[in-house]
């Protein structure tokens, strides 16, 4: 096994397991401890993993740093636009909708061109997009409260008190990570607000691109099998099939 093959194998192992110990690599690949340590440093420099005491953890499995709203606008835009167009086809005139925070939902807001809708959101960028379309029959409401600047979403007691009184025919929301059937986000505040909206919605649609599948985040706020369907891209068929073991994926 040459160096390139060895680095590739170590990357596959750490991404599959999430974390791996140095001695596991030594025994599995039959190489020296010093060789493994050099390989881990090289893979860390490439951004594939992070060295930890006695081993390494995958950078693709756990989202240790919450990505800012600005950064999200530069990632998987083509996939997100594909998802948004597909999600828009699920909306019908007369619906009362809840739109959660996230760049994919913002793109959905751009796609909406229905005549008669009521849309409630706790996300400022989503609200600004929809407000441009407001008419006597196309009504848009922003739920207030404490704003999280990294996502520009309103959460907390005030937002939750308003949500408790509302009911929706459909909810469209996104997530930072989906793993083993759990849908995850970065904070307890956003998790609880999303849970409230979900509990008050008849149909529930999760919008995610393929990069979110297999990742983990701080807390889960629902399970895939509690939803109506998932709307996602087909860039990674294996990940689509993984989601299909829990819930329908919209064609």
From Swiss-Prot:
KW Protein biosynthesis (keyword) present: no
Task: Name the GO terms of the biological process aspect.
Answer: lactose metabolic process; regulation of DNA-templated transcription
* DNA-binding region positions on the chain: 20-39
Record key words, sorted: DNA-binding, Lactose metabolism, Repressor, Transcription, Transcription regulation
Disulfide pairs here are none
Q: Which SUPFAM superfamilies match?
A: NagB/RpiA/CoA transferase-like, Winged helix' DNA-binding domain
Pfam families per the UniProt record, alphabetical: DeoRC, HTH_DeoR
- Look up the domain of life of the source: Bacteria
Query: Domain HTH deoR-type spans what residues?
Result: 3-58
Query: In Gene Ontology terms, what is one molecular function of this protein?
Result: cis-regulatory region sequence-specific DNA binding
Asked if the keyword Transcription belongs to this entry, the reply reads: yes
What is the annotated role of this protein in its UniProt record? Repressor of the lactose catabolism operon. Galactose-6-phosphate is the inducer.
PANTHER family per record? GLYCEROL-3-PHOSPHATE REGULON REPRESSOR, HTH-TYPE TRANSCRIPTIONAL REGULATOR SRLR-RELATED
Which protein, by its recorded name, is this?
Lactose phosphotransferase system repressor
To which species is this protein native? Staphylococcus aureus (strain NCTC 8325 / PS 47)
